């Protein structure tokens, strides 16, 4: 059974609020780079970049990050990591920049830890922040989001499903029991 938690308008409002918070906390956007975690985090990052351009009249670089090779729960740790999956990210100048990692849902924190490992393998930014559309709790690692669209406390057996129009043909967040 699924329950709608956020419709398209609620998602838009949440992303707009995150955008304003990014501007306020960073005192502008000139030294910011947005990095979306594949798959849905990339589309959320692009939307935030579009809104930042509207508000600040500045093109924000947006990168895509594939963390599959960095997940400790999905790969054999004896195998060497390949940076080919993130070669497009290596083209971005992250040195001394403020990187904002963007994902759809924050849950255990393992995805974010893997993303930080991937970024540090590429370059060393001045700062890494985290923006998520939904924070559902249940952290296994000491990671928290700096920018949150909506906190949705869930039971361990529940699941949050984020759908974005770019790949799912609609914007909606559902809670699945």
UniProtKB/Swiss-Prot annotation:
Keyword Transcription regulation present in the record's keywords: the answer is: yes
Q: Which Pfam families match?
A: Pribosyltran
Q: Which reaction does it catalyse?
A: UMP + diphosphate = 5-phospho-alpha-D-ribose 1-diphosphate + uracil
Q: Which GO terms describe its biological process?
A: DNA-templated transcription termination
**Listed InterPro entries:** PRibTrfase_dom, PRTase-like, PyrR, PyrR_bifunctional
**Short motif (PRPP-binding): ranges:** 99-111
Molecular functions (GO terms): RNA binding; uracil phosphoribosyltransferase activity
In terms of SUPFAM superfamilies, this protein maps to: PRTase-like
The answer to whether the entry has keyword Secreted is no
Classify the source by domain of life.
Bacteria
CDD domains reported for this sequence = PRTases_typeI
Q: What is its EC number?
A: 2.4.2.9
Sorted alphabetically, the keyword list is: Glycosyltransferase, RNA-binding, Transcription, Transcription regulation, Transcription termination, Transferase
Purpose: Regulates transcriptional attenuation of the pyrimidine nucleotide (pyr) operon by binding in a uridine-dependent manner to specific sites on pyr mRNA. This disrupts an antiterminator hairpin in the RNA and favors formation of a downstream transcription terminator, leading to a reduced expression of downstream genes.
- Provide the family line: Belongs to the purine/pyrimidine phosphoribosyltransferase family. PyrR subfamily.
- What do we know about how this protein assembles, alone or with others? Homodimer and homohexamer; in equilibrium.
What is this protein identified as?
Bifunctional protein PyrR
What organism is listed for this UniProt entry? Answer: Pediococcus pentosaceus (strain ATCC 25745 / CCUG 21536 / LMG 10740 / 183-1w)
């Amino acid at each position: 059974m699924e329950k709608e938690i956020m419709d398209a308008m609620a998602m838009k409002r949440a992303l707009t609020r995150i955008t304003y918070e990014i501007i306020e906390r960073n005192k502008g956007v000139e030294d910011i780079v947005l990095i979306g975690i594949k798959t849905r985090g990339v589309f959320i990052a692009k939307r935030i970049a579009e809104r930042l351009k509207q508000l600040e009249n500045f093109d924000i670089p947006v990168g895509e990050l594939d963390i599959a090779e960095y997940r400790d729960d999905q790969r054999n740790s004896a195998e060497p990591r390949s940076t080919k999956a993130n070669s497009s990210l290596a083209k971005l100048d992250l040195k001394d920049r403020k990187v904002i990692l963007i994902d759809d849902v924050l849950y255990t924190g393992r995805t974010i830890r893997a993303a930080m490992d991937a970024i540090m393998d590429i370059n060393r930014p001045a700062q890494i922040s985290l923006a998520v559309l939904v924070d559902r709790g249940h952290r296994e690692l000491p990671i928290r989001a700096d920018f949150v669209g909506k906190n949705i406390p869930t039971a361990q057996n529940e699941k949050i499903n984020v759908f974005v129009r770019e790949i799912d043909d609609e914007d909606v967040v559902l809670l699945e029991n």
